[in-house]
Amino acid sequence: MERKVFSKDGKEIGTINLDDRVFNIEISHGSIYNAIKNELSNLRVGTSSTKTRSEVRGSSKKPWKQKGTGRARVGTKRNPVWIGGGIALGPKPRDYSYRLPKKVKKLAFKSVLSLRAADENSFKVIENFNVESGKTKDLALIIKNFASFNGKVVILLGNDDQMIKRAGKNIRDLKILSFDKLRVVDLFYAKNLIALESAVNKLNEFYIK
């Protein structure tokens, strides 16, 4: 698949090949769903905790005798039915993370890249560039040539360029990611996806293995 390449000023300067084995496969929505679920689950801290009837403070003495009072029978003030009692079936600290099979994860990345590449308006390939100043305004001027800031924007890099990442720190709803540190959830929910030439070449090599 051929795709136009733009300069950082927004002018068309050539084309680049998007490998069909990465950017033009049959989309597996199930693998995308499972990958996003996995990524979000792995982010969960899992520290929610409640006290059971055995953990709350208070006497375990029977409030009144079993029979003869006309009241409902009760065994302890720590009963979950009572105010101040324990919580029945409440959350406890747990680990929500789990591993996704490599084949499913790889298929999810290929599927979401194919999904995004199918829309030329929201997926742009631009020449490799540097932001030597590290200033936000310099990067913002480049981004405005390809995307509006009324939604999430993701920039894909071919390497870990710290100056570009530094320049983008203060831009709301912008994520700058290296090709080897992508998440399906970021690619799927981005309104605009901007990939540098080097990132496309690296993705072509990385996912056809």
Swiss-Prot record:
Gene Ontology molecular-function annotations: rRNA binding; structural constituent of ribosome
Keyword line: Ribonucleoprotein, Ribosomal protein, RNA-binding, rRNA-binding
Stored InterPro entries: Ribosomal_uL4, Ribosomal_uL4-like, Ribosomal_uL4_dom_sf
Chain coiled-coil ranges: none
Query: GO terms for biological process?
Result: translation
Cellular component aspect of the GO annotation: ribonucleoprotein complex; ribosome
Q: Does the keyword Ribonucleoprotein apply?
A: yes
**Domain of life where this protein originates:** Bacteria
Basic residues composition bias: residue spans: 59-72
Q: Which family does it belong to?
A: Belongs to the universal ribosomal protein uL4 family.
Q: How does it assemble?
A: Part of the 50S ribosomal subunit.
The free-text function statement in the UniProt record for this protein reads:
One of the primary rRNA binding proteins, this protein initially binds near the 5'-end of the 23S rRNA. It is important during the early stages of 50S assembly. It makes multiple contacts with different domains of the 23S rRNA in the assembled 50S subunit and ribosome.
**NCBIfam families tied to this protein:** rplD_bact
From the Swiss-Prot or TrEMBL record, give the protein name.
Large ribosomal subunit protein uL4
Q: Which organism is it from?
A: Borreliella burgdorferi (strain ATCC 35210 / DSM 4680 / CIP 102532 / B31)
**Gene name linked to the record:** rplD
